[in-house]
Amino acid sequence: MKKHVLAMAVAASTVALSGMAQAEVKIGFLGGFTGPIETLTPPVYDAAQLAVQHVNEQGGLLDGQMIEMPTGDTTCSDASAASNAADRLVNSEHVTAIIGALCTGATIAAANNAAIPGGVVMVSPASTAPAVSDLADNDLVFRTVPSDAFQGEALARMLLAKGIDEVVVTYVNNDYGRGLADAFVATYEAEGGTVAENLAHEDNRADYRSELGTLSATGVPDLVVLAYGDTSGQTVVRQAYESGMFTQYIGADGMVISGLLDNVGEEVLNDSFIATRPGNPDTPGTERFVELAEAAGISHEAVFAGQGYDAAFLLALAIEQNGSAEREGVAPALRSVSSAPGEVILPGEWEKAKELIAAGTEINYEGASGSHEFDEKGDVPGVVEEMAVEDGKFVSKGFLDK
């Protein structure tokens, strides 16, 4: 074959047309509704829910079944919570597939302890650490976002292109932070940059002044913070600013969230914060998603929103292609519907896709966040976007070459 908040989410988890009696097909959603990415999760969930809405409004799955999307809170930082949430979806909710998780550690825990043993395909829209690629997953774990091996290289080259040739780095001590820091430092130093100090820090602490003191002792004014904007990342930046230690703050996707702006403030970040995040290239699929998201009143600009829509829509296409709500066969069907050649399907074009699949015509989904040609590890290529804070808002400064 070819290749917002937890309560709101739970209350809205059944997306079905009222009064319909068809059986439901369950696709679960695992996200960090509480914890260090609690402001990042709702827009991703909303985008996935929008994809489910499009499927349900245009005939549903298979013989008219509606998709139901039960949720699970991984907390992002607690492997036990992630495992338990995934176990409930796999063994109690009996989902056919899972969107998520979002944080890398949560995805790995959920996969190893529930999804892989249960034969359930997971598609993460946000787990970026290289460690996901190394899972012994029986071809069950995919992602619609590029690996941090890609983003770390792009961030390093972005700084060097700006003439920032010496930095200090602090990263959150988990799979996400370590993977991103390793990729960044390796490329930055290999291409002529100097990392004067590189320190891990633990998440969810109230005080990082000791680490900041060590970093500032180098005399380097440019601080790279590879962490979460809802927890350690915002505290590190705020305390660095209060002490006058640094003049430039640099981050990655975990920092490009509303919690950083809300809790640190534009007076600190305006014209002094730059970052990278996975971006959505200018394609017919991404343009279509902007229209659909705006019509639905959700943010198309939120980090990982496009990837969340694609994870949900791709899983629906795979189930339709597979011809049943059984778990077996979803993975090869996912590879089939996501890759060329085939009749192009854009976001929202469920009715068209359903008719083509029924006719035995090959399809190729071109998504909200770009093309998703999964490699042998379930990874996708992608683009990285430069971000900055201007007038109290995150703004895109364009796409970066790797």
Language-model region placement:
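Sec/Tat signal peptide C-region and signal peptidase I cleavage site
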Residues: L17-A23
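Extracytosolic ligand-binding ectodomains
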Residues: K2-V10, A23-K402
